[in-house]
Amino acid sequence: MNSELNTPLSAETTLPTPALQGFRLMRFEVLNWGTFDQQIWHLAVEGDNSLLTGNIGSGKSTLVDGLTTLLVPTRKLAFNKAAGAEEKERSLESYFHGFYTSQQDDYGKARPVGLRGKDHYSVLLAQFHSSALQQSVSLAQVCWLPPAEKRVKRLFLVAEQPLTIASHFTGFGDKIAGLKKRLKLQDGCEQFDTFPPYQQAFCKALGLGSDGKALDLFNQTISM
């Protein structure tokens, strides 16, 4: 897998204005997420208001779901709502494996077909920056499938600095333990095994409050 390739995705942006305060999304990156396969893909919005456009099936909802996965608690995730899809049409597992079609097995039952098997990892990463505070915050999630397991596991990270997939999430070998060990040496980088403490950490870092209302509003807006 050549994860060093870094492929830009297009998003129309407007010029920044003084009204754009607080932490703004600067860059969003994905690796092995849905049909964004085998290399790093990124959106560089640089804190501006942006409009994501593309043909049907080009991956717009896949990217939106990736950003939602970084910010919304697992129990509240409703993938592909931005495209008006039915519940359970997509899942964390389907994005991890890159399911893109289905085919019938020998018994006539439809089975999903994916771009990837079990021996890989997926990464979601978002960089935020506050011009007023001159501070950066990065959120990341790493997904992998342990041997002999069917459920995807996740590592959650909050860092008070700009991170990138190419610089911080590649070249650590074939064990997630190697990545965890490397990231422990990164200043201002916290690791979590579950979503609740991760959410508490990034809400504090981004100034979102502790009641979860800002994230609930974000999730409702995405679903409209």
Task: Spell out what each predicted region is.
Residues 1-192, 207, 211-213:
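Extreme N-terminal "head/tail" segments of very large remodeling/mechanoenzyme assemblies
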Residues 199:
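Conserved P-loop NTPase mechanochemical-coupling segment
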Residues 208-224:
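Extended heptad-repeat soluble alpha-helical coiled-coil rod/stalk domains used for dimerization
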